[in-house]
Amino acid sequence: MKALCLVAHPDDCVIFALSYIHHHPELSWTIGYLTYTDSDPRGAEMAAFWQRRGINTVFLGFEDHWQDDEQKQFTRWRSEPAEAACWNLAQHYDVILTHDADGDYGHIHHQLVHRAVARHYHVVTFAPHNQGTVTLTVPPGTYTLDELPMHGDIIRSFHIDQHRNSYKEPQ
């Protein structure tokens, strides 16, 4: 089965999705990003991280601008084309792993990605710790933050002691 992890920003897939991806190797994964391109330094670093694990990446290329989340409105682009781009990518996959409806912690880009794919028949969402239907841990040594120097500080801030995530799976 084909699975898509569709997230807003390059670091989101490691912060929120790596546990699920690691525990579901039977799925043929692709990582999709709302923001950045594979030629941006952050995009290139994350694409290389997933390439080393045999996972392809797709970047939709929308600009990631801090003012969007601060002002709770899109300042550089309209939401409709972004939602359409997310859906156009997602509709070709059997399983979608993505942000929850609240945008995990209220981030406007995360909320947009969720809205765009919520109608898919098999959506797994990130959940607050221990509030999902399943909680998974990434075994130590699966990755190191040395692989992701541009993203390490933010990833470390979410996973201080161990890399553990909760998810809500369709019932």
Please provide the spans of the model-predicted regions.
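Short, Lys/Arg-enriched, disordered terminal segments
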Residues: 1-2, 171
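Active-site beta-strand->loop->alpha-helix modules in alpha/beta enzyme cores, enriched
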Residues: 2-122
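The feature marks non-catalytic terminal segments
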Residues: 49, 87-91, 95, 122-171
